[in-house]
C-alpha cells in the first residue's frame, strides 16, 4: 500500500500489537479505596468463594478491551470446531449502547428502574451507591455487593446503576453532544500512543458504590483514563 506521499507502507506500520496484563489489580482496595476495610478485602475479594458473584474491580480499559478480543476468538474457535455459523464479535458498548441498555426499553426515565427517585415507596434505596457524604452503608453495603442484590431493569440487566462503574468504548469529550446524533451516536476517534492524556479518556457509565446518586442516572457521564483500575 502507498501512503499520501506515494511511499510504501508496510503492515507493521498500521497494525499495532500490544500485550496487556490480563489480571485485575488485586491491590486496588489499598491503593484506591481508602475507606473500605481494605486489608481483608485485599486478601479475600479475588479468591474467597464468598465473593464469587461480586463484580470484578481493578480492571483498566485496556484489560476490558483485551478481554473482548480474547472472548471473541474463543467463541470463533468453538463455532468453527462445531461447524456452526459465526456471530458478531464481543466488544465494549458505546456510550449510546450502554444508555439504551440501561433504560431497559423505557423512554424519558432518569434511572434504570424507571422512576425519578433513588428510593422506592417504602424508603428503600434502589441501588448500591453513596447516599450522602461519607455514608457508604445506608444502602446495606459498605463496598460492592452481590450482583443480584437489587432487581434488574426491564431488559433483565443487573447493576446498570451502582455497584461498579462500566467502561464504554467511547472517547470522552466535554462537547460530544455537538457531534453526536441518532445517525452518529458515538464520539470516537483513533488514539495514538503519543497523544496527550486528555485525548485518551474513555466514558464510564452507571456510577459505583462510592459515587453519589447523580452518577447513577441513565444520562450521567464521567470518564477515566485507559490505564485506570479503580471502581471499574
Where in this protein do the model-derived segments appear?
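Functional-site microenvironments in short loops/helix caps that host divalent-cation chemistry
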Residues: 10-230
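Non-catalytic, alpha-helical, charged scaffold/linker segments
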Residues: 3-5
Amino acid at each position: 500500500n502507498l501512503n499520501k506521499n506515494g511511499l510504501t507502507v508496510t503492515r507493521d506500520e498500521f497494525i499495532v500489537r500490544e500485550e496487556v496484563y490480563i489480571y485485575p489489580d488485586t491491590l486496588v482496595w489499598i491503593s484506591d479505596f481508602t475507606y473500605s476495610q481494605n486489608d481483608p478485602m485485599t486478601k479475600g475479594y479475588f479468591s474467597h468463594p464468598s465473593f464469587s458473584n461480586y463484580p470484578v474491580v481493578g480492571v483498566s480499559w485496556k484489560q476490558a478491551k483485551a478481554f473482548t478480543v480474547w472472548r471473541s476468538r474463543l467463541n470463533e474457535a468453538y463455532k468453527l470446531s462445531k461447524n456452526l455459523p459465526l456471530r458478531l464479535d464481543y466488544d465494549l458498548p458505546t456510550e449510546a449502547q450502554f444508555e439504551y441498555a440501561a433504560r431497559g426499553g423505557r423512554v424519558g426515565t432518569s434511572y434504570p428502574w424507571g422512576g425519578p427517585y433513588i428510593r422506592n415507596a417504602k424508603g428503600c434505596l434502589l441501588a448500591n451507591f453513596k447516599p450522602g457524604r461519607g455514608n457508604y452503608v445506608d444502602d446495606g453495603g459498605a463496598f460492592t455487593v452481590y450482583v443480584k442484590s437489587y432487581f434488574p431493569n426491564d431488559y433483565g440487566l443487573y447493576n446498570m446503576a451502582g455497584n461498579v462503574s462500566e467502561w464504554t468504548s467511547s472517547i470522552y469529550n466535554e462537547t460530544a453532544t455537538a457531534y453526536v446524533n441518532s445517525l452518529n451516536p458515538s464520539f470516537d476517534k483513533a488514539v495514538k500512543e503519543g497523544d496527550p492524556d486528555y485525548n485518551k479518556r474513555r466514558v464510564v457509565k452507571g456510577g459505583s458504590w462510592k459515587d453519589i446518586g447523580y452518577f447513577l442516572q441513565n444520562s450521567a457521564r464521567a470518564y477515566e483514563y485507559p490505564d485506570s483500575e479503580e471502581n471499574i
